[in-house]
Amino acid sequence: MIVGIGTDIVQVSRMTALLGRYGERFPRRILTGDEFKKFSVSKQPAYFLAKRFAAKEAAAKALGTGFGSGLRPCHIGVGHTERGQPFLEWQGRANELVRILGVSRGLLSLADEKEYALAFVTLLAEREGAKPGLSLERALNSLKLSGNGNGVTD
């Protein structure tokens, strides 16, 4: 069953401008530790960031929250299999949300063309009769009740 879908497009020149303005502060804020290591040796850092940022935005949209309720870009990671297939990695608040929503698998597709990077995310659950909208409300309420809904990051 599909729990959520999300898509995002990022202009590479926007990432170039952010890198010029903030230097490493911007990638350190949005990337996971593993992603930052790869970013540090990337030959095309703006393209690297554009793809990662698009993937993180698309995943946040698929979760139904966007970036809010304590969910930050660094809670969503992007990795690749040995054959190059991209996949999502959940950390912190994102990990809590996918667990509460019953997400069993996240599918990620990435594309780029000249000045743009695009990401599409589909979140799947194995359980029958799941109600994603109700689950999202329950997830957000659960985070508030556990003291994690105040925007404090893990």
UniProtKB/Swiss-Prot annotation:
SUPFAM superfamilies: 4'-phosphopantetheinyl transferase
UniProt keyword annotations, A-Z: Cytoplasm, Fatty acid biosynthesis, Fatty acid metabolism, Lipid biosynthesis, Lipid metabolism, Magnesium, Metal-binding, Transferase
Gene Ontology MF annotations: holo-[acyl-carrier-protein] synthase activity; magnesium ion binding
Cellular component annotations (GO), alphabetically ordered: cytoplasm
GO biological process: fatty acid biosynthetic process
Primary localization: cytoplasm
Location relative to the cell: Cytoplasm
Family annotation (Pfam families): ACPS
Enzyme Commission no: 2.7.8.7
Cofactor: Mg(2+)
Disulfide bonds: none
InterPro entries on file: 4-PPantetheinyl_Trfase_dom, 4-PPantetheinyl_Trfase_dom_sf, ACPS, Ppantetheine-prot_Trfase_dom
Binding site for Mg(2+): D8, E57
Domain of life: Bacteria
Catalysed reactions listed for this entry: apo-[ACP] + CoA = holo-[ACP] + adenosine 3',5'-bisphosphate + H(+)
Summary of the function given for this chain in its UniProt record: Transfers the 4'-phosphopantetheine moiety from coenzyme A to a Ser of acyl-carrier-protein.
Family of this protein: Belongs to the P-Pant transferase superfamily. AcpS family.
The protein's name: Holo-[acyl-carrier-protein] synthase
Record gene name: acpS
